[in-house]
């Protein structure tokens, strides 16, 4: 049930009847304060200006045409022309019943699209670090939300599995007689990578051999391809352990590494030349873009093939976008890549559009994000100043959560405690990130994220168990409740019901904007409203059975909404804490 969309269409029709143009926008918003109703229509100012009339006058005319019978109990004009809409308690009660009768809590499915989501993208032969966390979990929230809404989602893990580093690694492995790479752990490869880079920089003979190995690898030599495949396999096996720990939905089948697009690159360069988009410049092949200027104010040159015939990331990203449209048949492509890559992506996509590889009707969206910072406001590092490995971060989260959970549950069985600690610890790390606007940097703080107060995973998980405890005390099951009516008489009942029915609107925003913090804010607000409702509207000691059962149903929908909302974030819920 999308009340916002329903009201938007009703108010828009009334605006048109009052003389507004057919493309007018009512600007229906959830009201910030209860005295302004449940929703506000804020679009009168902009439309009235076009019509040359006072906004309040337009609002008055709109009200004469606005039929919200059975939806709103009161509609009033406020200030210069805002229209405040108060939802009818009977309308709320009816739709709470409908939501409870639905496995999807009444959430509709929009027109199905094929959506490619590019996220995580670790590098081969390197362990995942904290810099991969944001892309991985924000992207996974988008995937979960879009799939719940009924879209066909293709996960694209754009793994860095190609380039000169493989010449270095294979040459060094060979030198160290470690050709059976399949038996090695990724931690060994990290050391090998550092040693290989050191030798590459300091030993010209070794560097030359590494460059030759890259050529052999790229030419398809089976020995070198097999070594490369082993390196990829070790890396992705290790990464899968991290994905499973993080409770994200990526699997090995979702890997679409840079190497996938290699066969396309020569044809793309030739095609861009044939279309007059790419030209030779100082030995390289370059596309000059008017949309981007260099320091002299001239069109910026984007290299797609180097003098030595090598290709660049831009060339791969052009091929990647083309593949996602032509082969995967994407209607929309979302990229969860950090903000530092924005100009690079914009340049690649400008070339993609000019070449006609992806039509303008198919959105290519960079859902960029900021950095994770330490308490000092600088990029999050180890005490020694090194990069924090993601596995180490999750280990520490689990250890801290174990201590926290054991302190609160001294007699809990060990296996149950471990399961609870895992849900709390991993959930805390994820929620702390997801609850922040993805476009901003944020401070990583263990104490805040593991707190049982505020907008945190432990608080949300506890809020869920608190609602469940009401049912345990009531000793009533869902089947017994099903036939009971929902009756809304108290203000706090109405406020909770209205917020519960805004779940679909929240999902729609997350799906459109890729903003998990909107879902976190909604769930936190919902938990707070339930707390106020529970305090002021007795459930188990209600004045009669009808009121008791009605309030139990509001509690029931609250529990289901919290669980489903947290599930879209990949946050595990628990029955007891």
From Swiss-Prot:
<comment type="subunit">
    <text>Monomer.</text>
</comment>
<dbReference type="InterPro" id="IPR036695">
    <property type="entry name" value="Arg-tRNA-synth_N_sf"/>
</dbReference>
<dbReference type="GO" id="GO:0004814">
    <property type="term" value="F:arginine-tRNA ligase activity"/>
</dbReference>
<keyword id="KW-0648">Protein biosynthesis</keyword>
<keyword id="KW-0067">ATP-binding</keyword>
<dbReference type="Pfam" id="PF00750">
    <property type="entry name" value="tRNA-synt_1d"/>
</dbReference>
<dbReference type="InterPro" id="IPR001278">
    <property type="entry name" value="Arg-tRNA-ligase"/>
</dbReference>
<dbReference type="GO" id="GO:0005524">
    <property type="term" value="F:ATP binding"/>
</dbReference>
<dbReference type="Pfam" id="PF03485">
    <property type="entry name" value="Arg_tRNA_synt_N"/>
</dbReference>
<protein>
    <recommendedName>
        <fullName>Arginine--tRNA ligase</fullName>
        <ecNumber>6.1.1.19</ecNumber>
    </recommendedName>
</protein>
<dbReference type="InterPro" id="IPR001412">
    <property type="entry name" value="aa-tRNA-synth_I_CS"/>
</dbReference>
<keyword id="KW-0436">Ligase</keyword>
<dbReference type="GO" id="GO:0006420">
    <property type="term" value="P:arginyl-tRNA aminoacylation"/>
</dbReference>
<keyword id="KW-0547">Nucleotide-binding</keyword>
<keyword id="KW-0030">Aminoacyl-tRNA synthetase</keyword>
<dbReference type="InterPro" id="IPR014729">
    <property type="entry name" value="Rossmann-like_a/b/a_fold"/>
</dbReference>
<dbReference type="GO" id="GO:0005737">
    <property type="term" value="C:cytoplasm"/>
</dbReference>
<dbReference type="InterPro" id="IPR035684">
    <property type="entry name" value="ArgRS_core"/>
</dbReference>
<dbReference type="InterPro" id="IPR005148">
    <property type="entry name" value="Arg-tRNA-synth_N"/>
</dbReference>
<comment type="similarity">
    <text>Belongs to the class-I aminoacyl-tRNA synthetase family.</text>
</comment>
<dbReference type="Pfam" id="PF05746">
    <property type="entry name" value="DALR_1"/>
</dbReference>
<dbReference type="InterPro" id="IPR008909">
    <property type="entry name" value="DALR_anticod-bd"/>
</dbReference>
<feature type="short sequence motif" description="'HIGH' region">
    <location>
        <begin position="122"/>
        <end position="132"/>
    </location>
</feature>
<dbReference type="InterPro" id="IPR009080">
    <property type="entry name" value="tRNAsynth_Ia_anticodon-bd"/>
</dbReference>
<keyword id="KW-0963">Cytoplasm</keyword>
């Amino acid at each position: 049930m999308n009340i916002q969309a329903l009201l938007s269409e009703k108010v828009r029709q009334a605006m048109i009847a009052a003389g507004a143009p057919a493309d007018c926008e009512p600007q229906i918003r959830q009201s910030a304060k209860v005295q302004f109703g449940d929703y506000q229509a804020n679009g009168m100012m902009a439309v009235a200006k076009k019509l040359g009339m006072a906004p309040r006058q337009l609002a008055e005319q709109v009200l004469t045409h606005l039929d919200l019978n059975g939806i709103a109990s009161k509609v009033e004009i406020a200030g210069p022309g805002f229209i405040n809409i108060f939802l009818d308690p009977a309308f709320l009660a009816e739709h709470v019943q409908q939501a409870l009768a639905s496995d999807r809590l009444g959430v509709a499915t929009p027109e199905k699209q094929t959506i490619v989501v590019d996220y995580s993208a670790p590098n081969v032969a390197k362990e995942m670090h904290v810099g991969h966390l944001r892309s991985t979990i924000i992207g996974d929230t988008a995937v979960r939300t879009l799939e719940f809404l009924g879209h066909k989602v293709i996960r694209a893990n754009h793994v860095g599995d190609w380039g000169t580093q493989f010449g270095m690694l294979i040459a060094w492995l060979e030198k160290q007689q470690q050709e059976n790479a399949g038996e090695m752990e990724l931690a060994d490869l990290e050391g090998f990578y550092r040693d290989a880079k050191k030798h590459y920089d300091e030993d010209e003979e070794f560097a030359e051999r590494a460059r030759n190995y890259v050529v052999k690898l790229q030419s398809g030599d089976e020995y070198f391809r097999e070594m490369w495949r082993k390196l990829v396999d070790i890396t992705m096996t290790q990464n899968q352990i991290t994905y499973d720990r993080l409770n994200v939905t990526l699997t090995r089948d979702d890997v679409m590494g840079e190497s996938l697009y290699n066969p396309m690159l020569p044809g793309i360069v030739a095609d861009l030349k044939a279309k007059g988009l790419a030209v030779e410049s100082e030995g390289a092949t370059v596309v000059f873009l008017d949309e981007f200027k260099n320091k002299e104010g001239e069109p910026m040159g984007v290299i797609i093939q180097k003098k030595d015939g090598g290709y660049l990331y831009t060339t791969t990203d052009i091929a990647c976008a083309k593949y996602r449209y032509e082969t995967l048949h994407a209607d929309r492509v979302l990229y969860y890549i950090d903000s530092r890559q924005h100009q690079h992506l914009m340049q690649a996509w400008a070339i993609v559009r000019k070449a006609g590889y992806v039509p303008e009707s198919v959105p290519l969206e960079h859902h960029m994000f900021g950095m994770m910072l330490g308490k000092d406001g600088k990029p999050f590092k180890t005490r020694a100043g090194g990069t924090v490995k993601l596995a180490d971060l999750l280990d520490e989260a689990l250890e801290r959560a174990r201590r926290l959970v054991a302190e609160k549950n001294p007699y809990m069985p060990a296996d149950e405690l471990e399961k609870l600690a895992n849900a709390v610890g991993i959930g805390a790390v994820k929620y702390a990130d997801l609850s922040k606007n993805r476009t901003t940097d944020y401070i990583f703080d263990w104490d805040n994220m593991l707190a049982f107060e505020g907008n945190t995973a432990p608080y949300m998980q506890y809020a869920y168990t608190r609602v469940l405890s009401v049912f345990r005390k009531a000793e009533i099951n869902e089947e017994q409740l099903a036939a009971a009516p929902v009756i809304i008489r108290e203000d706090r009942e109405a406020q909770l019901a209205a917020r519960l029915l805004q779940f679909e609107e929240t999902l729609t925003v997350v799906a459109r904007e890729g903003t998990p913090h909107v879902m976190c804010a909604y769930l936190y607000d919902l938990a707070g409203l339930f707390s106020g409702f529970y305090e002021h509207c007795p459930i188990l000691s209600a004045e009669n059975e009808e009121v008791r059962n009605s309030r139990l149903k509001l509690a029931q929908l609250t529990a289901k909404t919290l669980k489903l909302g947290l599930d879209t974030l990949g946050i595990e819920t628990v029955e007891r804490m």
